[in-house]
Amino acid sequence: MPKPSSPPSAHDVARVAGVSKAAVSRAFTPGASIAEETQNKVFRAAKSLGYRPNLIARSLNKGKSGIVGVIFGGNPRNPFFLTALYALLARLSRAGKHILVFTVDSHANADVHAEDLLKYRVDALLLMATSLSAKLAEQCHDEGVPILFFNRRPPKIKGFSSVAENNSEGGRKIAEHLLSQGYKRLAVVAGSDGSSTARERESGFGAYLTSRGLPAPEREVGHFHREGAVQAARNLLSRKPRPDAIFCVNDYMALAAIEVARYEFGLEIGREIGIAGFDDIDEASWPSFELTTYSVSMESIIDGVAAFLLNTARQKNPLHTVIDGVLKPRRSTQRK
């Protein structure tokens, strides 16, 4: 049985086109200086031979792969994460970066996928709604691969960078707003206990209540999922006395809480039960919800992430960017 022939090389293209190997390289490099006639010769020869340039090998020759590794552990049904992920991929693609995305269960750490991505010689590693062990983080550091956390700051890992919303301030502003509207019995639907994002939002909310001499809010955990939020809202609304306002630490859970309060308990949203969220996803402004929320510009978040990932060679020390937002009061907390 004859051995399969090896794929054509740049040397083969140069020979058929009658040009130098350097000319072949320039022909496939966007923006490189090369005569149009020479480039056309190279393209015709490449097509006839079935040649495709090895972009990864070319990048590695320059010391960088041009690949950003992304490990995504967020709820794929949450519009916040989908919007962020697609916006980021578009931004990095426009900048000429290649993106390799791995998904991981939200309850697992990203070690296995991080090890795989290191084999691809990624220029940087972005973690969205997932975490990494201290051992793997140290391995990334030793191999010169910077780590960036999206909207999360895990306390047990050193040497990482982060871009995050001002989560604690957002929680504080939600609490202040609910009290200003006359709500007195406040509760919270928390996220996952292992999430720094959830902890910071809940902490800011509770700290403001404490500063006003009020007790800690009643609490149920929604795990950032619709099903968890539905059960958490049911549990809270079944208590005696019932809370008159609920802060859900993201909009996705808040929308579920509104539906439970409205359709299962027959409550008028705003007047009989206030519900607030966090993130300002598109659905929050829909007439059927009109959800009060804390809004951080997605463009600002992506700007911060892209600025880091596109300038990894200049990042000598960890950077932590915190992006402020604004409270967006809507009908879901209009009691007066």
Where are these regions (language model features)?
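Short acidic/polar active-site loop segments enriched in Thr and Asp
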Residues: 20, 123, 183-185, 215, ...
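Hinge/beta->alpha junction and helix N-cap segments in small-molecule ligand-binding domains
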Residues: 73-83, 101-109, 152, 163-173, ...
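Hydrophobic structural packing positions in well-ordered secondary structure
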Residues: 13, 24, 42, 68, ...
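Flexible loop/turn connectors
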Residues: 217, 234-336
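Alpha-helical recognition/docking segments in bacterial nutrient-uptake
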Residues: 1-5, 67-176, 238
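Short beta-strand segments enriched in small/hydrophobic residues
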Residues: 16, 21-23, 60-76, 177, ...
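N-terminal helix-turn-helix DNA-binding module of bacterial transcription factors
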Residues: 1-66
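Glycine-rich phosphate-binding loop signature in dinucleotide/nucleotide-binding domains
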Residues: 49, 119-121, 181, 236-242, ...
